Curated annotation (Swiss-Prot):
This is Rhodopsin. It is a multi-pass membrane protein. The modification N6-(retinylidene)lysine is found at residue 296. A motif ('Ionic lock' involved in activated form stabilization) lies at residues 134-136. The lineage of its organism: Eukaryota, Metazoa, Chordata, Craniata, Vertebrata. It is found in: Membrane; Cell projection, Cilium, Photoreceptor outer segment. The chain crosses the membrane at residues 37-61, 74-96, 111-133, 153-173, 203-224, 253-274, 287-308. The gene is rho. It comes from Zeus faber.
Length: 354
């Protein structure tokens, strides 16, 4: 084994010199330069500084403007709530521990940080799945005359919480566990050991199949079908400029959605799977730290991709920030009108760019 395993931790360094200590009790400055911990703390501060206002503003603007309280926006609000869970329950803890150079909050703090980070990430992931399914059902119409209503939105939100808890709760009760990872300042699922009594192997396989591979497959399938439907509609109305514009808008949205998901989560999932399947191989603390901390940036990407690209929401947000007036009223109004025209045109071919 190319690491040191303790009762509730795994440090990626062989303890041949006797310097390895528990990440709950001692600074881990022997792993990397102490300046690296300061950089992590600064990075987490940046995510908090940006992530909290953006996601809180999403909730506040939606509550202030009744026209934004649509069934589909329930899912988008759920996404913002998930991001706030990550910011408040995970990012603040990680920033604090990074400032100290070890997981100063102890085993209980590790469980809480790992739980909130996993819960928030999974709620966000399954919210994206619900959005993908909603777009596929409404746009491609595999079910005739289906209308996405408030009841469907509530069921979708409940589903995201159910699936998120199915992934984040078991490690609290003995099916796998949360341990410090990377530079030992943040906690995650134990991919590193086969500790007796925790059944890490079965949980990691369950998590990768049910909470990564399946959601990714659903997202690709739904948005793939959506893109095909938009292209078919555009081909049938090649002389319609509004339809062509709608095709470009939907294509851009789909590409950004898929790329954003992959950029945030694929590096972390790939490294975690590599560590799980190559237990005993040599790897440094930075090997897991970089993708783990990069995945946390999804709390910023999500609202920008799924909320700020919505013209109506952007108009309401500017109105709120500017004390009830939108200084870009004419430009935003023209843009919103064009968007509505595109939606109406493409709707006649059973496609909507929203």
């Amino acid at each position: 084994m190319n690491g040191t395993e303790g009762p509730d931790f795994y440090v990626p360094m062989v303890n041949t010199t006797g310097i390895v200590r528990s990440p709950y009790d001692y600074p881990q400055y022997y792993l990397v330069n102490p300046a690296a911990f300061s950089m992590l703390a600064a990075y987490m501060f940046f995510l908090i500084l940006v992530g909290f206002p953006v996601n809180f503003l999403t909730l506040y603007v939606t509550m202030e403007h009744k026209k934004l309280r649509t069934p589909l926006n329930y899912i988008l609000l759920n996404l913002a709530v998930a991001n706030l869970f990550m910011v408040i329950g995970g990012f603040t803890t990680t920033m604090y521990t990074s400032m100290h150079g070890y997981f100063v909050l102890g085993r209980t703090g590790c469980n809480l940080e790992g739980f909130f980070a996993t819960l928030g990430g999974e709620i966000a992931l399954w919210s994206l799945v619900v959005l993908a399914v909603e777009r596929w059902v409404v746009v491609c119409k595999p079910i005739s005359n289906f209308r996405f209503g408030e009841n469907h939105a509530v069921m979708g939100v409940s589903f995201t919480w159910l699936m998120a808890c199915a992934c984040s709760v078991p490690p609290l009760f003995g099916w796998s566990r949360y341990i410090p990872e990377g530079m030992q300042c943040s906690c995650g699922i134990d991919y590193y050991t086969r500790a007796p009594g925790y059944n890490n192997e079965s949980f990691v396989i369950y998590m990768f199949v049910c909470h990564f591979s399946i959601p990714l497959t659903i997202i690709f399938f739904c948005y793939g079908r959506l893109l095909c439907a938009v292209k078919d509609a555009a081909a049938a109305q090649q002389e319609s400029e509004t339809t062509q514009r709608a095709e470009r808008e939907v294509s851009r949205m789909v590409v950004i959605m898929v790329i954003g998901f992959l950029i945030c989560w694929l590096p972390y999932a790939s490294v975690a799977w590599f560590i799980f399947t190559h237990q005993g191989s040599e790897f440094g603390p930075v090997f897991m730290t970089i993708p783990a901390f990069f995945a946390k940036s999804s709390a910023i990407y999500n609202p920008m991709i799924y909320i700020c690209m919505n013209k109506q929401f952007r108009h309401c947000m500017i109105t709120t920030l500017c004390c009830g007036k939108n200084p870009f009223e004419e430009e935003e109004g023209a843009s919103t009108t064009a968007s509505k025209t595109e939606a109406s045109s493409v709707s006649s071919s059973h496609v909507s760019p929203a």
